[in-house]
């Protein structure tokens, strides 16, 4: 905007203030009693009107500098300017990224790296916890099933508190929630290293660290899915390999570390490493994406016109010309800014309006949308996750005890877990590239992998020596990698709920998994305690995967409407029409009832 009609126009960022007739923007710098450091910059290119705003002291200093021929100092040379630049840069780093469409890159690559290390210090540690099982049984003199409850409670809290994680992320942002989760994880693991009873670990690792795992993992994978569209499958699959590399590295490393410093100090060391999750959470910048059919100009002008209409409600005259044709607004031209002026303000403050407009809509959005439970396709997919969780954690926990029970050396048994992790890496990456192809229906690929995973779980019960377990571990790792890296991002696909409901659907989906997460490892441990055979633990995993395959096969038919009655579409259309009528503001429109009645009489007259 120009000052006194002089000088070239300069685009500036600022806060918007609105009065009855115009929209002005003020400088976002701190208030100063007399013009501030801007008065030291010399002649203002926007004219003398700006110079008169400076105080007499600073204005006199500026005149004296021009009299002696000295150039005014740069803003960077003053301490006040440096502090303002630091504050500006910090606000820029904390500001949300605004895109007109899904970027498929940009800052999303930093988010992908953060998700990789979050996977390392969350699920990587959970899957590597099996190396402590024999030490905990000897130290606490407890049975296998009671030790299994540590991970069971942890997984239960991780999944049960998923809706809470979604609500907190929508309320306070993903970054703050993930950083708080990293602190809780480290606190619980460090506290567990001083435990004297097994139930102490139920609270420290099970409850405290389990809550931290939920706060760290779910918001990270949710915001990563928002940064990518076409590359979502491959990026998520590659980033999720962090847990695989963690298992490959941590299993032999922790085993060797225990021999030198004991299991307690090893657990303390792991807890300190998990503080890095707070660094990963600091990189999660929020993202705002406009509607797919809106141009920047349309998104910018619409909120401004809406505010203008609200401020000038008494000066606006509207009427309903016809019941069938909808609502027609008739507004006085003097109350609407000119098109040239509107475009001029649009170009100058496009970024500020794009940032503030979505926030206005987000304030009205629910913190947790339970409407996903009305979709039968989501219910079937949630049941798939419920039964599949039985087979996710137990094999990694019992593969080392199974190898030791068959007479395999403990070091070679730990190598089985590392081999499983490496195979999982290739499974995740391969699934990412396969699912990234457009013609492929992704949910069918996942169904095939679930069936093959069920077969691999049954194969563990027939292995009797090292190479048989090695073959089963490779096959199981590759299949669980394809499922583990895609089952949550699959919610963003149109076959389930779509990207719009991804955040709420992920919270509800993981919450439903909590039941099997609590019952899975203890059920496997109970079978081991009764039979004294570790291979029996894989029967419950295989049975759960069979039921998961059946539920997953029903997702696509439910989405296509084959499982719905014929009247569901009509009822949904009626509800949408009723909602559209309720959204019309009553105090905004002044209905011309006389005009409507006149047209109604005209229609009733015979021709």
Swiss-Prot record:
It is a multi-pass membrane protein. One of its GO terms (molecular function) is taurine transmembrane transporter activity. Keywords: Cell membrane, Membrane, Phosphoprotein, Transmembrane, Transmembrane helix, Transport. It catalyses: taurine(out) = taurine(in). Residues 1-84 are annotated as: Disordered. It is found in: Basolateral cell membrane. Residues 1-105, 168-175, 224-233, 290-383, 436-442, 487-507, 558-607 are cytoplasmic. The modification Phosphoserine is found at residues 319, 322, 325, 332. Pfam families: MFS_1. The keyword Coiled coil does not apply. The chain crosses the membrane at residues 106-126, 147-167, 176-196, 203-223, 234-254, 269-289, 384-404, 415-435, 443-463, 466-486, 508-528, 537-557. InterPro entries: MCT7 (IPR030766), MFS (IPR011701), MFS_dom (IPR020846), MFS_trans_sf (IPR036259), Proton-linked_MCT (IPR050327). Residues 127-146, 197-202, 255-268, 405-414, 464-465, 529-536 are extracellular. GO terms for cellular component: basolateral plasma membrane. Belongs to the major facilitator superfamily. Monocarboxylate porter (TC 2.A.1.13) family. Forms functional complexes with BSG/CD147 or EMB/GP70 ancillary proteins. This is Monocarboxylate transporter 7. The gene is Slc16a6.
């Amino acid at each position: 905007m120009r000052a006194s009609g002089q000088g070239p126009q300069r685009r500036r960022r600022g806060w918007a203030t609105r009065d009855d007739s115009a929209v002005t923007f003020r400088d976002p710098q701190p208030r100063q009693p007399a013009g501030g450091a801007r008065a030291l910059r010399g002649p203002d290119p926007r004219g003398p009107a700006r110079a008169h705003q400076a105080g007499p002291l600073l204005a006199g200093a500026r005149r004296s500098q021009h009299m002696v021929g000295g150039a005014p100092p740069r803003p960077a040379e003053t301490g006040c300017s440096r502090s303002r630049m630091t504050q500006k840069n910090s606000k820029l780093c904390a500001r949300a990224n605004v895109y007109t469409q899904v970027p498929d890159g940009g800052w999303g690559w930093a988010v992908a790296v953060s998700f990789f290390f979050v996977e390392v210090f969350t699920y990587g540690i959970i899957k590597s916890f099996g190396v402590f099982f024999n030490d905990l049984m000897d130290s606490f003199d407890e049975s296998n099933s009671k030790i299994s409850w540590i991970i069971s409670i942890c997984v239960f809290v991780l999944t049960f508190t998923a809706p809470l994680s979604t609500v907190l992320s929508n309320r306070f942002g993903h970054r703050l929630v993930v950083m708080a989760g990293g602190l809780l994880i480290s606190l619980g693991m460090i506290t567990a290293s001083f435990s004297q009873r097994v139930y102490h670990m139920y609270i420290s690792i099970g409850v405290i660290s389990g809550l931290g795992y939920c706060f760290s993992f779910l918001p990270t994978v949710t915001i990563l899915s928002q940064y990518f569209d076409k590359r979502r499958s491959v990026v998520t699959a590659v980033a999720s390999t962090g847990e695989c590399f963690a298992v490959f590295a941590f299993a032999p490393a922790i085993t060797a570390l225990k021999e030198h410093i004991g299991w307690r100090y090893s657990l303390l060391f792991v807890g300190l490493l998990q503080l890095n999750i707070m660094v990963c959470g600091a990189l999660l910048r929020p993202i705002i994406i406009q509607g797919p059919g809106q141009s920047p100009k349309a998104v910018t002008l619409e909120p401004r016109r809406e505010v203008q209409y609200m401020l000038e409600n008494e000066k606006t005259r509207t009427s309903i010309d016809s019941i069938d044709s909808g609502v027609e607004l008739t507004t006085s031209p003097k109350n609407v800014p000119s098109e040239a002026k509107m475009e001029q303000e649009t170009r100058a403050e496009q970024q500020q309006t794009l940032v503030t407009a979505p926030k206005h809509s987000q304030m009205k959005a629910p913190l947790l949308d339970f409407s996903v439970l009305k979709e039968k396709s989501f219910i079937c997919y949630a049941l798939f996750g419920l039964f599949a969780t039985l087979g996710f954690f137990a094999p990694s926990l019992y593969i080392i005890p199974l190898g030791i029970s068959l007479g395999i050396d403990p070091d070679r048994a730990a190598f089985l877990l590392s081999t499983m992790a490496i195979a999982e890496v290739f499974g995740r990456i391969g699934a990412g590239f396969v699912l990234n192809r457009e013609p492929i229906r992704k949910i069918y690929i996942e169904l095939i992998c679930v069936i093959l995973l069920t077969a691999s779980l049954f194969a563990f019960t027939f292995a009797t020596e090292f190479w048989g377990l090695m073959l089963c571990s490779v096959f199981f790792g590759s299949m669980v990698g394809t499922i583990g890296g895609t089952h949550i991002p699959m919610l963003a696909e149109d076959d389930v709920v779509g990207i719009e409901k991804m955040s709420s659907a992920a919270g509800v989906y993981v919450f439903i998994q909590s039941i099997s997460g609590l019952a899975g490892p203890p059920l496997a441990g109970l079978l081991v305690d009764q039979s004294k055979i570790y291979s029996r633990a894989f029967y419950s995993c295989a049975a759960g995967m069979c039921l998961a395959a059946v539920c997953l096969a029903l997702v696509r038919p439910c989405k296509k409407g084959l499982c719905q009655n014929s009247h569901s579409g009509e009822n949904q259309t009626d509800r949408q029409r009723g909602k559209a009528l309720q959204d019309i503001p009553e105090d905004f429109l002044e209905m011309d009832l006389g005009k409507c009645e006149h047209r109604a009489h005209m229609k009733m007259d015979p021709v």
